[in-house]
């Protein structure tokens, strides 16, 4: 009888454990996904310079600092604006099917569990006003008007 009670107690303790909360969808989990997934590194201006401290006013609003390479100059999207254009199901579909230019690792996003994407959506929607759009992508043969990071050396072959 003691073994059964101890086993039941152990199972009940595990059920409330964060380890088993992996499939649950929540805003808090979305924050964790954004941190561990590296979303803030590009989509939150100043995040890296602040050594990982999230400025709520800037969180997930994208960046006006571009990434320049053979593909042109790309900018981290304002995810608050994107999320507000879509319902949660639409956000999941977009994230599972998108293909973007570098340096966005869209292939990593496509590998994410659906509950992670739904949690990310809930986190983004909790952040407040969407803010301004980021600059448009600049073709490779044009000079960007914003600061940018030279992401690939100019001597790299195109393609």
Range-by-range predicted roles:
Residues 4-14:
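Sec-dependent N-terminal signal peptides
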Residues 72-87, 91:
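Peptidoglycan-targeting cell-wall enzymes and recognition modules
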Residues 23-30:
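Short, intrinsically disordered, charge-biased short linear motifs at domain edges
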Residues 31-37:
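Local sequence-structure signature of Cys/Sec-based thiol-disulfide redox active-site neighborhoods
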Residues 88-96, 114, 118-121:
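An amphipathic alpha-helix signature
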Residues 41:
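Short, cysteine/histidine-rich loop/knuckle motifs that typically chelate Zn2+
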Residues 25, 36, 44-74, 102, ...:
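Flexible coil segments in periplasmic/lumen-exposed cytochrome c-class electron-transfer proteins
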Residues 16-18:
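N-terminal signal peptide c-region/cleavage motif recognized by signal peptidases
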């Amino acid at each position: 009888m003691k073994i059964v009670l101890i086993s039941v107690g152990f199972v009940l303790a595990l059920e409330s454990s964060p380890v088993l909360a992996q499939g649950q969808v929540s805003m808090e989990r979305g924050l964790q996904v954004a941190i561990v997934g590296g979303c803030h590194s590009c989509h939150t201006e100043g995040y890296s310079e602040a050594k990982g401290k999230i400025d709520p006013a800037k969180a997930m609003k994208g960046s006006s600092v571009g990434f320049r390479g053979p593909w042109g100059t790309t900018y981290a999207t304002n995810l608050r604006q994107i999320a507000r254009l879509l319902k949660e199901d639409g956000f999941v579909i977009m994230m599972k099917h998108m293909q973007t230019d570098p340096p966005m690792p869209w292939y990593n996003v496509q590998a994410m569990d659906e509950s992670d994407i739904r949690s990310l959506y809930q986190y983004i929607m909790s952040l407040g006003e969407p803010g301004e759009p980021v600059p448009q992508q600049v073709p490779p043969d044009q000079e960007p008007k914003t600061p940018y990071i030279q992401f690939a050396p100019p001597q790299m072959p195109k393609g």
